[in-house]
Structures are given as C-alpha cells and as structure tokens.
Amino acid sequence: MITAGSKFVTALQGLLSLLTILFISVVVEHRKKGLWLLPATLVYIIGFGLNVAAPGNSVRARSYVGWGYSPLESIGRSFLEGVKHLPEFTGSIVLMVMVMLLPLIWQALKETEYRFRYPGVVLLWSFCLYATGYTPSLYSLGHAGLSRTLNAVKITYLLLLFLNEIYWCGWLQ
C-alpha cells in the first residue's frame, strides 16, 4: 500500500517517524509550518488503517491462531529482541565505518548552526523506533520475523546508528 508502507514493519516505522517529525516541528520547535505535514499524516494513518483492516490479513491470521503474543507482550518483547540482535547487526565493519566517518562528520557539523540539545532523547527514540520493527512479527507469528523482515529491521538499525553518531558528535561540539 503506497500510503502506508508495503508491510507492517515499514508501515509502522514510517507512521511513527512521520508522527515524530510532526510533533517536533509543531510542539517542540513551535513552527506552524510543520502543520503542512498534517494532511500527509492523515492520509498515512488512513492508509495504515486500511492496510491493517484488509480482508486478507484476517484470512492469513487464521492460519497462525495461537502463534503470536498479545499486543502489550509483543511490544515488551520487541525491546528484548532489539537488544538480542544488537551484536548481530553491529559487526566490525560497521564499527570501522563509523570510526572512519568521524572526521567527516565532525568537520561537516562545524558549519551547522543547529543545536544538538537532546542526545539521550534521540538515542531512546531511536531504540524505540528500531524495536518496533520486531512488533508485527511477534504479534502475528510469535518470533522476531523471517529473514526479509530482519533485513528491514537491520537497515532501520544502521540508519539510526549513523543518525545517532551524527547527533552525538553535534552535541559534543
């Protein structure tokens, strides 16, 4: 579904990202310009609702009765899965690339006027967004997901890892 992502992992993470951008823009930064995101957010929410309510989902769910966890348990277990997969997703190559990027990031950030005031909040938000990647599979299947799902979660993790590297470097300057 174009308006809400192609599967529940990306749809859920996309929705949370869009809501976060809207919140930061309007509430935190007090910018009325952020309200231009409201129509897109509403379309996304409607699309996500249609995606969740699609008839094929209930048909498919009948094949997996008793496999998944409750919604709250799925959310809690998502954080455990997130911690469990950190070593697998953070290999030596990823760490080497992060170290190699440090001088470039540091230099680029010298020219910005943006103030990086909330590194802890960004780190916490990042982990929560990353963990949401496990929630749909835990809810429907009772495990972290198939390899294609884990690949999508890993990509999210890597993007957020580098976002945090940039943000923390900005905060340290």
Where are these regions (language model features)?
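Intrinsically disordered, polar/acidic, low-complexity terminal segments
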Residues: 33, 172-173
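Transmembrane catalytic cores of multi-pass membrane glycosyltransferases
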Residues: 5-16, 23-149
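Transmembrane alpha-helical segments
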Residues: 1-2, 16-23, 98-105, 157-172
